[in-house]
């Protein structure tokens, strides 16, 4: 329940005491840190990957925090600073973020969540924070003044902050604006009272912040022994995120407790994908409808009240004030008023309606615990037993094990709603309790596919119904509101086609498939494009050059592919100009063979001509090689790049940012700059033979420290379509050891 400003101030005072106790516990525990440090050994291999071996799980968590801080200390501390709502105070950026963190009491609620965790996992979170602090204390004089020691509450607050932005999102606000119009500004008729400090519908993320990317997600598949040369399952996964998200690899070993190799993101205290000697899994983003926006009818007789179940209820207001650093370095305050109903915080408001947001995501405080428990499981039954606890609020899970099982599980903390045909994707009626949910679906009620006859499962962020073309999951057996996505996009279509196209795969076949630069979109529309160009009477020089470039292009975005730059420019402008660009739209009866063709040949010709002129002007030729324009760049390394957005139907997903010279870069635009780019970065392939074999690649290296050789030592492998072996067994680690030490 929202509080008045006075009560909020009181809660802040109470929290300060709680935070003081948390910090005091670290101070009192300082004498124990050296003991934990002596209980853990970090062995860095020749790619800088830490293999953390500890006597206890608590010591292992301490070592994980320390090793992460060695590689990404500033990034971790900046994330936690933002989650505290203090970004603007120190940097002058992120004011909207800080307002939202204060609105949602992020630090206070995270401290409470920490106390609610099971005792053992609470110790692990605190130990991870202690490991980060150990590094900070050792390097205090070398770190900026804004770097602060952290608490276990900070670790949880970072996760919660991400969920807050998902729930109170600019994307939702924009969709409501499209449907209901831009709301009145303060002082205009219909605006709420007491808005001199602003109002909640102004909020969201900073204008400079990136919107949620439609390509965010991953590729994943698992092959059963019936579809592999070795007769054993193979698991492949590669997430797609911005390269500044900083995937990070490690192995955590506590004899008799855990021995897991995998990846996570900087600032996260557990590994979220990978394998142990028994099993492995990877995740891809799904689209569960975990959040509802309730349209509340405002009471015309009573300002700032709404009608619910026939009664008038007040909207409660909360004034949020943050500190922000001005350009001249001076501190200033920023104040904004937000509103809340009994159904949730008001994300948007019009003269007649207020829109309250309610979600399962924000309070999923056992998220990290869920992944940690999964990493300790030894077989399918144990894995499913952990999943049934429903600790992880989202994600498709693609699983394989040494016993020969493969499993796809569409996972979510999904509300149990009235399945009466209501479209829950944006706003739902909020005038009664009819659509207000209380309970969640059990995991056993969600879509899954275990050991299909086809011998494979795949997910490239597609709806669960298309996990296998030969073993479809029937959507009619599940509530209609489970999955927001309806269509099968081109990226999962090419995955299905490639998997279906080979009877059996070796591990080398799987590696080659991962790095294919084939573009499915080109195969679907290029025949129509060439036909339209060749039908032009008295063709211009641009059309002739376009025909030659498109006709000879290999339909790939390999570094040496000529014509791909031209085609991309053509498609981007054509599809932006034509609302329905395909001659045959996507058809659920032909989910992996549509869409196809071009709906408007005249527009296609016009946009191709303009694309020829554009590529000539910018690059000198319509047939410039893809790798002459697209670069993988880190420090002094500058290599031809390949890959493109998955929206073109690519399995090799890489997106680039433009530098000042017109080149497109994934990596660093200038030396020592933060990474840019998006898509393939971490790739893992696991074959469940005895002994287990695994390979991976981390495009931008294990460390963001520019002076570290491990900040760029894998980009050449990545550009060359190679994976490096994962050293999982003790003998292999020792044979490839760079250094060994205690924190």
Language-model segments: residues:
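Bacterial N-terminal signal peptides that target proteins for export
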Residues: 1-13
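Bacterial N-terminal signal peptides
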Residues: 11-21
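Boundary at the C-terminal end of the N-terminal hydrophobic targeting segment
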Residues: 27-29
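Substrate-recognition/specificity elements adjacent to catalytic centers across diverse enzyme folds
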Residues: 31-246, 255-257, 262-264, 270, ...
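Second-shell loop/turn segments in exported
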Residues: 60-63, 109-123, 358, 368-374, ...
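Glycine- and hydrophobic-rich flexible loops that cap the catalytic core of alpha/beta enzyme folds
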Residues: 257, 261-266, 270, 274-279, ...
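Hydrophobic alpha-helical segments
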Residues: 392-502, 574
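Terminal end segments
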Residues: 471-539, 628-743
């Amino acid at each position: 329940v929202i509080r008045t400003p006075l009560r909020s101030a009181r809660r802040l005072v109470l929290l300060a005491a709680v935070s003081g106790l948390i910090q005091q516990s670290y101070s009192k525990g300082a004498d124990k840190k050296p003991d934990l440090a002596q209980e853990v050994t970090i062995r860095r291999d020749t790619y800088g990957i830490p293999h953390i071996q500890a006597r206890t799980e608590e010591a292992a968590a301490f070592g994980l925090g320390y090793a992460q801080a060695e590689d990404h200390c500033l990034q971790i501390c900046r994330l936690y600073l933002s989650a505290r709502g203090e970004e603007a105070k120190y940097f002058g950026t992120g004011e909207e973020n800080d307002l939202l963190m204060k609105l949602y009491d992020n630090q206070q609620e995270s401290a409470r969540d920490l106390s609610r965790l099971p005792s053992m996992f609470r110790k692990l979170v605190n130990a991870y924070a202690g490991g980060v602090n150990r590094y900070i204390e050792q390097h205090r004089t070398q770190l900026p003044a804004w770097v602060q020691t952290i608490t276990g509450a900070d670790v949880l607050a970072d996760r919660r902050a991400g969920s807050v932005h998902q729930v109170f999102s600019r994307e939702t606000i924009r969709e409501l604006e499209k449907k209901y119009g831009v709301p009145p500004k303060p002082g205009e008729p219909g605006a709420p009272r007491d808005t001199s400090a602003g109002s909640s519908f102004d909020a969201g993320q900073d204008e400079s912040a990136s919107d949620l990317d439609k390509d965010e997600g991953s590729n994943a598949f698992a092959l059963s022994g019936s579809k592999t040369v070795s007769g054993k399952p193979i698991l492949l996964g590669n997430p797609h995120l911005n390269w500044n998200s900083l995937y990070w690899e490690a192995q955590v070993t506590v004899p008799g407790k855990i021995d897991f190799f995998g990846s996570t993101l900087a600032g996260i205290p557990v590994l979220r994908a990978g394998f142990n000697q028994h099993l492995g899994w990877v995740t891809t983003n799904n689209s569960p409808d975990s959040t509802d926006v309730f349209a509340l009818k405002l009471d015309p007789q009573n300002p700032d009240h709404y009608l619910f179940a026939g009664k008038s209820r007040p909207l409660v207001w909360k004034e949020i004030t943050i500190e922000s650093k001005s350009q001249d370095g001076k501190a200033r305050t920023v104040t904004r008023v937000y509103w809340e109903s009994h159904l949730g915080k008001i994300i948007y408001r019009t003269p007649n309606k207020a829109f309250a947001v309610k979600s399962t995501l924000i309070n999923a405080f056992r998220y990290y615990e869920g992944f940690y428990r999964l990493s300790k499981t030894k077989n399918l039954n144990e894995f499913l037993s952990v999943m049934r606890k429903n600790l992880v609020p989202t994600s498709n899970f693609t699983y394989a094990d040494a016993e020969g099982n493969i499993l796809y599980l569409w996972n979510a903390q999904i509300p149990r709603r009235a399945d009466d045909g209501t479209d829950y994707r944006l706003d739902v009626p909020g005038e009664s309790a009819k659509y207000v949910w209380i309970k969640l679906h059990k995991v056993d009620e969600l879509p899954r596919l275990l050991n299909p006859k086809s011998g494979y499962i795949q997910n490239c962020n597609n709806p669960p119904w298309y996990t296998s073309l030969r073993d479809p999951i029937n959507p009619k057996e599940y509530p209609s509101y489970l999955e927001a996505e309806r269509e099968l996009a081109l990226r999962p279509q090419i995955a299905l086609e490639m998997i279906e196209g080979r009877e059996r795969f070796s591990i080398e076949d799987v590696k080659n498939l991962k790095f294919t630069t084939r573009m499915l979109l080109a195969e679907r529309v290029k025949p129509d494009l060439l036909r339209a160009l060749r039908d032009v009477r008295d063709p211009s020089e641009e059309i002739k050059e376009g025909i030659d470039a498109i006709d000879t292009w290999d339909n790939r975005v390999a570094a040496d592919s000529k014509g791909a730059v031209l085609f991309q420019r053509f498609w981007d402008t054509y599809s932006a100009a034509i609302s329905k660009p395909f001659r045959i739209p996507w058809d659920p009866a032909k989910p992996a063979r549509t869409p196809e063709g071009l709906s408007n040949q005249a527009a296609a010709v016009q946009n191709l001509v303009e694309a020829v002129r554009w590529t000539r002007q910018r690059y000198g030729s319509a047939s410039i090689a893809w790798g002459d324009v697209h670069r993988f760049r880190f420090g002094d390394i500058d290599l031809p790049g390949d890959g493109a957005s998955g929206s073109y139907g690519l399995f090799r997903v890489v997106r680039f940012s433009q530098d000042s010279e017109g080149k497109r870069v994934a990596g660093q635009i200038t030396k020592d700059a933060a990474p840019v780019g998006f898509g393939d970065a971490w790739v893992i392939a696991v074959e469940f033979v005895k002994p287990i074999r695994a390979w991976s690649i981390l495009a931008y290296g294990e460390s963001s420290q520019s002076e570290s050789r491990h900040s760029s030592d894998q980009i050449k492998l990545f550009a060359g379509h190679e994976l490096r072996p994962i050293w999982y067994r003790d003998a292999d680690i020792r044979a490839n050891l760079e250094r060994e030490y205690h924190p």
